[in-house]
Amino acid sequence: MDYGLKDKVVLVTGSTKGLGKAIAELIAQEEGIPVVTGRREKEVHEIMMELREKYQDERIQGYCVDFSELSSVDFIFDVIKKDLGSIDVLINNAGIWPTAYVVDMKPEDFERTIRVNLEVPYLLCQKFVQEKIAAQQKGKIVNIVSQAAFHGSTTGHAHYAASKAGLVSFSISLAREVTKYGINVNMVAPGMVRTPMTEEALKAKPDYDNGRIPIGRVAEPEEVAQAAVFLASKCADYYTGITFDATGGMLMR
């Protein structure tokens, strides 16, 4: 299947490991131009060079960005514009998953979770649609949400669930606003995915999938990445405001 991603510039936030890295790799595999981002310069450089070498494409870029800082939004758009031109697809994947039950939760932890998981994606989406509308160009946004946005959390992640629920409502509202400009906004809702972010939790509860995931196992990053790449592609031109459940049956909505 031709996804129509050849030569498309795709910003993937949080893409040095886990799901984000898997998405960036699939974009490169489709001859798109992934923009790798992460907080650690060494990791960003290593992944960028790995993808450049594997897919023989020197256009693949990587930038060290801390998306807990609001200033990161203007920075990433400016450097991409300088090096590659405009962004064709925005994939908001960067996020944090701190653990704290509400009774013990610190306000600063709640605020940081909302900032990284909701406020910065809002600002990135805003900047993206402003530029696309001004240039009269079509575009695609894929926001990575979570099954917790729909079911809440039972494992000490109420702030995470709240941030992702907010991103769901925001994404649907944005889709209603910008579809007339040829901009599609969709979501992928993973369940538990085997990534560095979830590694400790899975070690602590090795039987997590027993009885919770009908398919009987946690997801590998590549499985969820396929959903994100589909929604980023021309194959999803008729889809907007939808949530692609990639939960192994946890949602079944």
Language model: regions and residue ranges:
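Short, small/polar-rich loop/turn modules that mediate ligand/substrate recognition or access, typified
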Residues: 179, 184, 239-241
